Amino acid sequence: MSILETFDPQVAEAIRHETERQEYNLELIASENFVSEAVLEAQGSVMTNKYAEGYPGKRYYGGCHHVDVVENLAIERAKELFGADHANVQPHSGSQANMAVYFSVLKPGDTILGMNLSHGGHLTHGSPVNFSGRFFNVVPYGVSQETETIDFNEVERLALEHKPKMIVVGASAYPRTIDFAAFRIIADKVGAVIMVDMAHIAGLVAAGLHPSPVPYAEFVTTTTHKTLRGPRGGMILCREEYAKTLNSNIFPGIQGGPLMHVIAAKAVALKEALQPEFKAYQAQIVKNAKALADELVKRGFRLVSGGTDNHLMLVNLTGTELTGKVAEESLDKAGITVNKNTVPFETRSPFVTSGFRIGTPAATTHGLKEAEMADVAGFIAEALANVDNDAKLAEIKGRVNVLMKRFPLYAHRLS
């Protein structure tokens, strides 16, 4: 038995069950991924014990020379990977990364343009229930009703009318390529700075499969998980002129001591992202997403904007009796994990929704390829045709488990 199993069998059991879920179920939540053993080892290291307020070479505590090494590695690797002037790897999350950027250039009450949450944006892009919507005057933009892609005519009209100090670009549920150059043109017309939140597409950007926002934005934020396949955390890239202000808005502005074990894991993940095989992995994510989208359309599902250019797609259930909530719950019983999601021009509550979101990063990490996407689409279609039949859903789960056992990832942790 392990030390944890001996001392705290309840926690050990929960970890084991979660490992089994990740190993044998089909993980299709677009914002989730599975890290490598090297990342897990770094995050579970003694770096967790060290307080290191401040920045490398300028700490408020002694004994920081080793943690300085890993933070400097993470910074330099991030700059190399994305071609950025400056990187801050201390944010605990993507939300705190966004908060630090806002506080670097905005005052309470300033106007920002951000993507409407129900059109694919994120809570921190100005949702009224979030700090971003409470501190700032938010003008939301969205997608065209005809194409379900970003309506740049609307973005320009709103920018000219409201003269925002910042335009927030990026999304949590947008399946198409984002035209950063078009946003830059609009921002320059009104003297606005741009913050791009590339949390979902950072891995694709790193691999050259999505245009980079770095040349077009004063600030770029990201999480280090999702497509980047690192530990849960945040990161900020910015132009050199903003580096000092940005750093002070992370510490001491909104955070105290950084999580050095997580920063060590970020450094490892960023090294992985610099390897040639990472580009092949990201290409497979996109191939799988396109294959899965095609297979779902063949089976009669309607996808927001008709398909995908990246790692995710949104299934639109408007006009059917199904809700996103029922779809999520039914698929979970079938061993398939997705999340309910609002769709553009949503008519249902965000707790019910008219859609669900699917992403391929985690399944691709397991090793699934285009050939398996037909099976995955079949499982989804069959499960959603049997939402009231628990026995059938359990039978589908058995077949999902058989499929996933062909693609082991953490099986050695269960032996």
UniProtKB/Swiss-Prot annotation:
Keyword Transferase among UniProt keywords: yes
Associated pathway: One-carbon metabolism; tetrahydrofolate interconversion; Amino-acid biosynthesis; glycine biosynthesis; glycine from L-serine: step 1/1
Entry EC no(s): 2.1.2.1
InterPro entries assigned to the protein according to its UniProt record, in alphabetical order: PyrdxlP-dep_Trfase, PyrdxlP-dep_Trfase_major, PyrdxlP-dep_Trfase_small, Ser_HO-MeTrfase, Ser_HO-MeTrfase-like, Ser_HO-MeTrfase_PLP_BS, SHMT-like_dom
Catalysed transformations (reactions): (6R)-5,10-methylene-5,6,7,8-tetrahydrofolate + glycine + H2O = (6S)-5,6,7,8-tetrahydrofolate + L-serine
Main subcellular location: cytoplasm
Swiss-Prot/TrEMBL site (Plays an important role in substrate specificity) positions: 225
Keyword RNA-binding: no
Cofactor dependency: pyridoxal 5'-phosphate
Protein name: Serine hydroxymethyltransferase
Keyword terms: Amino-acid biosynthesis, Cytoplasm, One-carbon metabolism, Pyridoxal phosphate, Transferase
Residues that bear N6-(pyridoxal phosphate)lysine: 226
Gene: glyA
Pfam families, per database record: SHMT
Function field: Catalyzes the reversible interconversion of serine and glycine with tetrahydrofolate (THF) serving as the one-carbon carrier. This reaction serves as the major source of one-carbon groups required for the biosynthesis of purines, thymidylate, methionine, and other important biomolecules. Also exhibits THF-independent aldolase activity toward beta-hydroxyamino acids, producing glycine and aldehydes, via a retro-aldol mechanism.
Biological process annotations from GO: glycine biosynthetic process from serine; tetrahydrofolate interconversion; tetrahydrofolate metabolic process
Molecular function terms, GO-annotated: glycine hydroxymethyltransferase activity; pyridoxal phosphate binding
